[in-house]
Regions:
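Electropositive polyanion-binding surfaces
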Residues: 1-177
């Protein structure tokens, strides 16, 4: 499976390479399969992206890799090792949304106000470039101390997440914790 992105693929996708993007995962994670992006569009209007590695670009339906992944259904995380659903080169390198590497993604993009009102949304194929990898602990420390790399972006995402969570509970969502 070639790791290079064909030139014609860029033309088919929305370009998010210059949008602030980062991953937040466990400290021992190797496969960064999702990322968040955020940019201010204008006063009180933000564009938030949830990006998932586009494995379908590399694994065609019905292929040997696809059939094996379907059998496995998920990666298995054991204490001493991981049994990946996909070949290691694919999940830990080609499709891993590692910092400073251009990657293909399938993305949900939301335009929302500071009050969490979603004004527009779309699901699109994108090309992204993650700016940084955070562990859960690093992101939490930025939220608590309001200091660190990309603090404005992380704090805005945290604020929007809390507003959206409150709206869900007000609308009747159940918390199972």
């Amino acid at each position: 499976i070639p790791a290079e992105i064909p030139a014609e693929e860029y033309a088919k996708r929305e370009d998010f390479r210059n949008v602030t993007t980062f991953t937040i995962d466990p400290k021992d994670a190797k496969d960064f399969d999702d990322a968040l992006s955020i940019r201010k569009l204008k006063d009180n209007l933000w564009e938030v992206g949830v990006h998932i590695a586009d494995v379908t670009h590399y694994v065609t339906e019905g292929s040997i890799i696809d059939k094996e992944a379907e059998k496995r259904a998920t990666s298995v995380y054991l204490v001493d090792r991981t049994i990946p659903m996909l070949p290691e080169r694919l999940c830990n390198f080609i499709c891993s949304l590692r910092p400073d590497e251009e990657k293909l993604a399938y993305s949900a993009i939301f335009e929302m106000t500071d009050k969490g009102e979603v004004k527009n949304s779309r699901i699109v194929h994108t090309v992204i470039k993650s700016d940084r990898r955070f562990t859960y602990e690093e992101a939490q420390q930025i939220i608590e101390t309001k200091e660190g790399d990309f603090k404005e972006e992380i704090l805005k995402l945290d604020s929007l997440a809390k507003i959206l969570r409150e709206k869900r509970f007000t609308a009747g969502a159940i918390n199972f914790d």
